[in-house]
Amino acid sequence: EFLKQHPDSVYRSYVWGFVCHYSLDSTAHPYINWLAEKLAKQRPWETASTMHGEIESALDAIVLRYETGKLPSEVALKAMFPKNEAVERKIAHLYRQILFSLYGDDVSEESLVQAMNDAHGVFSLVTDRTGLKKKLFERIERGKPSAIASHIVPLTENDQIDYANIQNAPWGDGDSHQSFFELYGEAQGVAGKILGEFLEGDLALL
């Protein structure tokens, strides 16, 4: 309804991106959650949550290399989240309407803009061009859950762990064998279906 009432390319592109994110999460999270539990059992000081962060950070590096041929050291994360006040205010307006419509929460647009600015700052802080930040926090958090280190994208992933399941090893209940890249491809199909029916279709059937 919001997009019908606000035919603006900023709103549309943001929502399209959100749908793509949702599609990948819903498709890949069963595998990621399973692997996170497995790694947490192997490292008693960690939690499934921190291992989830480590897996997604490793996959960020893997997908970046796959899609662009670049290493994380060549990318400033905050550039993935550029500051643009006009765009931020439109996104804040979108979220304000959604939060009120779905939950009855009257959140100010200023608070939502501040949340985006905070996120931009976090992206800047976890950009690690040399690998030294990750090593520092790994040392600080040694023997404890890696709440910070696990969210810093590594220059290259730990080659002792097949994060993307390239070997198609069984996972979950043992009947699943898809690699992350196969799930990635499935997610593109899910996103295409949602977006193809977004304004008119019954998304509850997806």
Label every model-predicted segment.
Residues 1-17, 22-206:
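N-terminal leader/auxiliary helical segments
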